[in-house]
Amino acid sequence: MISPDVGGGFGYKGILAPEEVCLGWLAMNCNHPVRWIEDRRELLVANANCREHSYKVTAYANAKGRILGVEGEATVDAGAYSAYPFSSCLEGEQVVSILPGPYIIPSYSCKAYSVATNKAPLLPYRGVARTGECFAME
């Protein structure tokens, strides 16, 4: 396989797509060069996606408005399967660890669920889970 240097190793560039495996197999077994051309629209529709989250966040504060505690629950659409080499649980794990953000919260708990669906696989992009959790917390 010949792939030009595109820099980085995250997002779509960091995974092994099923089509790439099939192309290698075809080329070796057909003893013939195989070319795969995919436009941007096809890639974005059929390849891995991310950031389809659902949040339930409850904040507890005293009479002066100081936050005393936060309870969170997140459901992450993980798609039909993991995008190798990443786990479909990565987004949910990040939500749990970064939901409080920069705030000092004396009591914090959060549950995250990665749910398998019939959609394209989940792929962590730059800023894994941060878009949804920042929106939910604020």
What name fits each language-model region?
Residues 1-138:
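Structural alpha/beta core scaffold segments of enzyme domains
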